[in-house]
Amino acid sequence: MVLVGAYAGLRWGEAAGLTRAGIDVLRSRITITSTAVEVRGHVTLGNEPKTSRSKRTVPVARSVMRRLEEHLANFVGPESDALVFTAPRGGPLARSLFSRRVWQPAVIRAGIPHITFHGLRHSFVAILVAAGCNVREVSEWAGHNSVAFTLTRYGGLFEDGSDAAVDRLDALLGDGSKDPDNVLQLHTRNLR
């Protein structure tokens, strides 16, 4: 479950409600069409995702998909609606149970203070940016309601492109270091 949070950017409810039908092993994709919602310890399935853009298909690294494929083979029923992640005795996984019995003890053992499951989404976005994905792709795959939100929240992770622009301009115009007398003539029209 941690892998789909960190490497596919799924929200808790999306991961808890993920079914076998949402996993395309051959294309290495996860499709989100519904979520699980917990109210006072009771989990309901088949709920609408957070926003209309939350319904999405996310590319997943093949190394992560191989681990997910092993999980499917060993722990998930063959039915298309079989939940990928379940409670210890089967059935939907409650966030409160997972947090108390699995997540918090693991975080403490790892020595990572105050990280939440949702924090894994932030890691996912950072990984996409580091991999060179553009803001539109990041926004779409994270299920954000707009590119503007992605830029507001994560804009500092994206390179602004200025260094690349300088390199392209130097390639076009020259950097002036070889012959200072070699000046590109700019012609203008008389605007009178």
State where each predicted segment sits.
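C-terminal secondary-structure termini that scaffold catalytic or DNA-interacting sites
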Residues: 27, 36-64, 77, 88-91, ...
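Short, basic (Lys/Arg/His-rich) helix/loop patches that form interaction surfaces
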Residues: 8, 58, 66, 70-96, ...
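Short, polar N-cap/turn motifs at the start of nucleic acid-interacting alpha helices
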Residues: 22-29, 114, 133-155
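Structural detector for helix-capping/boundary residues
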Residues: 18-21, 101, 123, 152
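Short, charged phosphate-coordinating catalytic segments
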Residues: 5-36, 136
